[in-house]
């Protein structure tokens, strides 16, 4: 059902080749690659965005590289380094999926303008101190001032970072012709904090 709906939606928006491109590059593993989200800007001009998200269960870097190859201007070296820095020592990202996102515009209907890769870092670290250190290393590699990230993290929570995991749930890499960069997502932990040791034990016995 979802593939047909997404294909039809893209066609109605004038992006007639978009679904085939997404399927060829990101929906390659039956039962493991799946459409997750579909979004669009609610205004009409040539720069209005249509975005398609694909989740990759139990995926390695190769799946991300194949997905990124749909965008001619995407940098595969950035994708490799992103996965290596945040998923230190991990060859298969299990438990929580990697997520690919494609941004299409009417002005560039033949191919996506950008490719984004979302990595659920909380699933692959023992605690938020480790997550913070890996994010800092990533920001340094991209020449981004880490002080903004540090201030935001301090404002969101005053607990010891080594005492929990999940304060930094996802990190995203955006590569392509439109505003390449890094996005770091923070959680308010409004209901509870996942204990660091509990999370580590779950990973060890997964």
Q: Which residues does each PLM region occupy?
A:
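C-terminal structured domains
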Residues: 49-206
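Extended, well-ordered protein cores
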Residues: 1-15, 19-51, 55-57, 70
């Amino acid at each position: 059902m979802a593939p047909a709906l997404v294909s039809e939606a893209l066609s109605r928006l004038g992006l007639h080749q978009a679904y085939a491109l997404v399927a060829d590059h990101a929906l390659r593993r039956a039962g493991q690659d799946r459409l997750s989200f579909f979004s669009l800007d609610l205004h009409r001009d040539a720069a209005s965005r249509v975005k398609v998200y694909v989740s990759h269960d139990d995926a390695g870097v190769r799946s991300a590289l194949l997905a990124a190859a749909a965008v001619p201007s995407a940098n595969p070296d950035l994708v490799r380094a992103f996965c290596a820095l945040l998923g230190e020592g991990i060859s298969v990202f299990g438990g929580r999926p990697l997520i690919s996102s494609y941004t299409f515009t009417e002005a560039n209907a033949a191919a996506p303008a950008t490719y984004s890769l979302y990595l659920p870092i909380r699933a692959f670290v023992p605690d938020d101190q480790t997550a913070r250190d890996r994010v800092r290393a990533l920001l340094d590699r991209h020449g981004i001032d880490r002080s903004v990230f540090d201030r935001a993290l301090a404002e969101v929570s005053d607990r010891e970072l080594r005492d929990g995991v999940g304060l930094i749930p996802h990190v995203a890499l955006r590569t392509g012709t439109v505003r390449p960069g890094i996005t770091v997502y923070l959680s308010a932990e409004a209901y509870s904090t996942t204990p660091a040791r509990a999370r580590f034990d779950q990973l060890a016995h997964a």
